[in-house]
Structure formats: structure tokens, C-alpha cells
Amino acid sequence: MDNVDFATLSIFDIDKEGKQRTDTMPSPDNHREQTKIALFHGGVDKHFYDNGFQVEDDRVTNDTFDGYDMVLLGDIHKRQFLNKEETIAYPGSLIQQNYSEEPSHGFLLWDVEKRKATYHQVENDYGYKIIFVENGLIRNKMKFVPPKGNIKIKYTNTTLEQLKNIQIDLRKKYPKLKDIVTERQDNISIGDDRENKLDISYITDV
């Protein structure tokens, strides 16, 4: 790539207290090329996790990368931009990693000259889906169910028989599902607790 210089702030550059150093970040003035891109794998400034929780890093901030045209970040799995110009960004993980992450994942494709990124989704048949069941009925929308993925059923006020029937229906509709697990959300007794803890993967072939 012509006329582009990359600079990296290493997560291994830490002080005696184990905190991230920023004085090792190369100055953009040391680069002669027209476009200067900074790279870092770690938490920067105010950023969000997939659970919606926001954290703030007071060691590495947006100002750490002043003078760079774009900052490409890693580590945080949630896709987000950290400045209004949208030149400092986490692309997020390439595919969904667990139940806490949203199903939409992919990568950012950068137009270096325009300093703009476009999001491209990567289709994934092996994702994760949480299904909420109340009174024996599925309550959330079923717009996206990974056909070869993992399902977690969170249920309340639902009998064991109702729960098994829901799993049977899911297996019929999505026969290639990898796993279905259940998680009770209330204290209502729905039968023998020992039975509730059984792995009911035997319905895989139904």
C-alpha cells in the first residue's frame, strides 16, 4: 500500500505497576507518508462491551493517537466508533463468540483516501441465540436462529414437559442445531430437580 505508514502501541509496554505506557507510541511527526494509521489492541477511552456496560480507560485515550489519520483497534468484541469523525474504531469480533454478543458481526472495510469505513457482515451458521419462554410459550422474536448454532432457553413458570416439547419443536425446525441448554429464571418447582439437571440431548434425533 503506497503512501501509508503504520504505528503500533504495544500492550506489552507496561510500567512497574503493570499499567499501559503511552509514551512509547511513535509520534506521527516521525512518519513521512501521507496517511498515518495507528494500531492498538486494548481498551481505549470510553467504550462499550456487548452487555451495554461502558468503561473508561484513563491511560489510553483518543488523544493518545493525535496526529494519526485513522486508528484501528482490537480486543473489544463490540463494533463501535470512538469519535464523531468515525476514524477511531473497533471492528468487533469477526463472528459471534458467545450468548452475550449480538448476532451481527463482521468487519470494517476502510477507504483510506476518504478516511471512511463501511461495515460488512459475515454470515455465521454457528452463532448463539437466547430464547425466552414464559408460561410454556416463546416470548421473543425468532428472526434469527443460527441453523447450526447454540440455543439457550431461559424460562419461567414452565413445566418440564412444556420445555421438552419446545426443544423437540426446535430440533424439528432446525435439525442441525449443535446444542440446546436451559436456564430457569424463577423458583417455581416444575418437577424433580434432579430431572431438570439432566442433559436432554437425547431428543437430538427426533
Model region roles, listed by residue range:
Residues 70, 74-126, 132-134:
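A conserved active-site cap/scaffold subdomain adjacent to cofactor or substrate pockets
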Residues 1-88:
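His/Asp/Glu-rich metal-coordinating catalytic cores
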Residues 2, 31, 83, 103, ...:
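A generic structural signal for short, non-catalytic loop/turn and secondary-structure boundary residues
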Residues 3-11, 105-106, 191-203:
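Short, surface-exposed amphipathic charged segments that create phosphate/polyanion-binding patches used
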Residues 15, 22-29, 38, 84, ...:
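A structural signal for the main folded, soluble domain(s) of proteins
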Residues 35, 104-105, 148-150:
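Short, surface-exposed beta-edge/turn micro-motifs
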Residues 112-206:
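Accessory, non-catalytic peripheral segments of nucleic-acid enzymes
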